[in-house]
C-alpha cells in the first residue's frame, strides 16, 4: 500500500470510478442493516476531495450502477442527485447474473488511458478479484492508483505494494456521523457492546 497524495500537473486527468453495487453491499455488511441517511456517503464531499487531489488537473467522477427491473422510480432521485453534483452515471439493467458493471468500469479506465492524459485512477470498490490485477498493471504503466472504500473489505488494496488506499470514512464530510465499526478485531481493553442486527421480535415474523 502506498501514499495517495499525488500533486497533478495542468492538463493531467484524475479519474474516479465508483462501483455502486459493491460499495452498497460493503456498507450494508459493515452496518448489518440498510444504511440510514446518516450513514450514506455524501458524494459532494467525495467530489471536493477528488478536486483537491486533481489540483490544476482535470477531475472526472463516474458512478457505475445496476438498475434492477421495477426499481427505476427508486433509483432515479439518487441518479439525478449524483448528476447534480457533477458525477456522470453509467447505469446498466440488471437482467442476468452476468450483468455486472466491473467490465464497464475497466473499459472506461482503458478508454481514458488510451487518450494519454490519465495521471491517476481512484477506484471505489472492494472487489479485488475484478480490479487488483488491472490496477497493478496501470501502476506499471506509470499511472498512480488509489482505492477508496472500507478497510474491512478492501483488503486487496491494503495488501498491494503499489496501490494506494484511503478509507472512505477518513475523507472529510463523507459521513454525517461516525460509522459503528466495532468488530471482534477492534475491541478496546474494557470490552464493548455489539448491537443486534435486527430486533428480537423479528423472530416472530413469518418467513
What is the meaning of each model-derived region?
Residues 1-103:
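Domain-level signal for Mg2+-assisted phosphodiester chemistry and nucleotide/NA-binding surfaces
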Residues 73-206:
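Nuclease catalytic cores that cleave nucleic-acid phosphodiester bonds
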Amino acid at each position: 500500500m502506498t501514499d495517495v497524495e499525488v500533486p497533478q500537473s495542468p492538463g493531467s486527468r484524475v479519474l474516479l470510478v465508483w462501483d455502486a453495487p459493491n460499495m452498497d453491499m460493503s456498507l450494508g455488511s459493515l452496518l448489518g442493516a440498510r444504511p440510514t441517511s446518516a450513514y450514506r456517503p455524501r458524494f459532494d464531499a467525495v467530489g471536493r476531495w477528488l478536486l483537491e487531489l486533481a489540483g490544476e488537473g482535470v477531475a472526472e467522477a463516474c458512478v457505475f450502477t445496476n438498475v434492477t427491473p421495477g426499481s427505476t422510480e427508486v433509483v432515479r432521485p439518487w441518479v439525478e442527485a449524483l448528476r447534480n453534483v457533477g458525477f456522470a452515471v453509467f447505469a446498466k439493467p440488471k437482467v442476468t447474473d452476468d450483468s455486472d458493471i466491473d467490465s464497464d468500469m475497466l473499459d472506461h479506465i482503458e478508454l481514458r488511458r488510451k487518450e494519454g492524459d490519465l495521471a491517476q485512477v481512484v477506484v471505489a470498490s472492494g472487489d479485488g478479484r475484478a480490479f487488483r490485477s488491472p490496477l497493478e498493471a496501470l501502476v506499471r504503466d506509470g499511472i498512480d492508483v488509489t482505492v477508496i472504500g472500507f478497510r474491512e473489505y478492501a483488503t486487496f488494496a491494503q495488501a498491494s505494494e503499489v496501490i494506494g488506499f484511503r478509507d472512505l470514512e477518513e475523507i472529510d464530510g463523507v459521513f454525517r456521523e461516525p460509522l459503528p465499526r466495532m468488530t471482534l478485531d477492534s475491541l478496546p481493553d474494557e470490552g464493548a457492546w455489539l448491537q443486534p442486527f435486527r430486533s428480537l421480535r423479528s423472530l416472530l415474523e413469518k418467513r
